[in-house]
């Protein structure tokens, strides 16, 4: 009898065990589609990014013009750029929904998978930040200046660290060059971390909406979930193309159509929408080091989720108190996102401070209390 190549070839069997014969819970919902959507986002960004890099010049005197040249003179250059810029937004939409799913259904109890996922989020944020600097518009330059300057809040070594990162005494040509190098490198780091993420996931298998073991009821990934994923791909890619073709600048900042000028500060310096919640938390503390620590904590607090889980049930499916808190947290993050886009004046300052406080309170205090309370109410 001939050997089945799919199951025996050293490379094909890895693909087979990850995408074809993978035993998968039979009841996972569309919330489990975002992992594969993130994979498609990464592939799209690497392909469009590579095509853009072929026409880009990492030099302060040429960067802005080279991006304009790509849009005007390169075949479909405008489309490639718009897909790449808006693809980043879709990447963040998918990752935030993916993390939200993990929080709701208790997926963070797969500790290794969860921790690698947070490192992936941090790497993605770094990639998006250095990428935003490359067109060398006003918001690129001032965004880079403001965010890199935050490192100067680190006691004793801060200023040295910032000048080392800049490669000089301000954001200038060396900064742009190294940011381009990092922006080219980091997506491949993300791809590598994704494989680690999947390796840990396949050690335990996927969680499911009920939060109970599903070993007794597994189905093969192909064809059931391959076809379901393809539907997700079609919906996401058609949305991305629609955004890139009909309103490519909807999510961008008009300030970035002006070439970078170190002598003129834009009236409102703000990052892209996907960083606004963290930016609002940073601004809500009237102390530089305190703000930087709060900014870091806003993401790093995710590492504590497995430790803060007090419920005897894994998922929130049958936990109404935690569900209410979860959706309050979502609303809270939307408020922070809105506040991050507003000028620093009343009433936005106090709203931002209250939203920042409630963000940490819900995660660190109220979720664990709700878990204990639900155990008592449900007599578990």
UniProtKB/Swiss-Prot annotation:
Free-text comment on the cofactor: Binds 2 heme b groups non-covalently.
Positions of transmembrane segments: 34-54, 78-99, 114-134, 179-199, 227-247, 289-309, 321-341, 348-368
Co-factor(s): heme b
Entry binding sites for a ubiquinone: 202
Gene3D superfamilies: Cytochrome Bc1 Complex, Chain C
One matching Pfam family: Cytochrome_B
Keywords annotated in UniProt: Electron transport, Heme, Iron, Membrane, Metal-binding, Mitochondrion, Mitochondrion inner membrane, Respiratory chain, Transmembrane, Transmembrane helix, Transport, Ubiquinone
GO cellular component terms given for this protein: mitochondrial inner membrane; respiratory chain complex III
Membrane topology designation: Multi-pass membrane protein
Subcellular location: Mitochondrion inner membrane
Record-level Gene Ontology MF annotations: metal ion binding; ubiquinol-cytochrome-c reductase activity
Residues that coordinate or bind heme b b562: 84, 183
Annotated function: Component of the ubiquinol-cytochrome c reductase complex (complex III or cytochrome b-c1 complex) that is part of the mitochondrial respiratory chain. The b-c1 complex mediates electron transfer from ubiquinol to cytochrome c. Contributes to the generation of a proton gradient across the mitochondrial membrane that is then used for ATP synthesis.
Similarity comment: Belongs to the cytochrome b family.
Annotated protein name in UniProt: Cytochrome b
Organism whose genome encodes this protein: Vireo latimeri (Puerto rican vireo)
